[in-house]
Amino acid sequence: MAKLYFNYSTMNAGKSTMLLQASYNYQERGMRTVQLIAAFDERAGRGVIGSRIGLEASAIPFEPDEDLFRLVMTLSGEGAPISCVFVDEAHFMTPLHVWQLARIVDRLGIPVMVYGLRTDFQGKLFPASQELLAIADEMREVRTICHCGRKATMVVRLDAQGKVLHEGAQIDVGGNEKYVSLCRRHWDDEMNGAWIAEPV
């Protein structure tokens, strides 16, 4: 039975690497996959999913107003059946895109695996991630670690001088030079200043 999977994490956890490996596993067995990425995310090139360890694969770039259900329905009528749809950087989608992916699962019977961030640098849910948390059939946390060794669940955004930013647009495409993954405690220290408990 097809399902909508949300694989979420903070930055630098290996989500894109996992996506590329999972898609390759299908392809190695002669199955067809469709890989999607937001058109404005050109870090690895337009229509390219790239990982920090150097793996890359071509993907179909989609625009904010694109109907992903219609796109996949059209593709499914061309060539071999589609065995799975993969979406990288899912937080760049709109909530409507999430529902279109759910329709791919429910109406076309094609599994959809999405990979993305849960929260932004201010600790707020991305709209698409919020929608995925609400309607995905299965959610899987992809883990990475803070510099202290604890599980990293948050991310801070840095300016060109490496200082932590507290304000700005929710979406700002960047990589290791712009974002650092931290545990909640160290994120709080960076965003709100080192907190010292008052004596009881």
From Swiss-Prot:
Catalytic activity, as annotated: thymidine + ATP = dTMP + ADP + H(+)
GO molecular function, a single term: zinc ion binding
Subunit-level organization: Homotetramer.
Name of the protein described by the UniProt record: Thymidine kinase
Family membership noted in the UniProt record: Belongs to the thymidine kinase family.
Pfam family membership, one: TK
HAMAP family reported in the protein's UniProt record: Thymidine_kinase
Keyword hit for Transferase: yes
E.C. number: 2.7.1.21
Alphabetical GO biological process terms: DNA biosynthetic process; thymidine metabolic process
Subcellular location: Cytoplasm
Top-level enzyme category: transferase
Domain of life per record: Bacteria
Originating organism: Rhizobium etli (strain ATCC 51251 / DSM 11541 / JCM 21823 / NBRC 15573 / CFN 42)
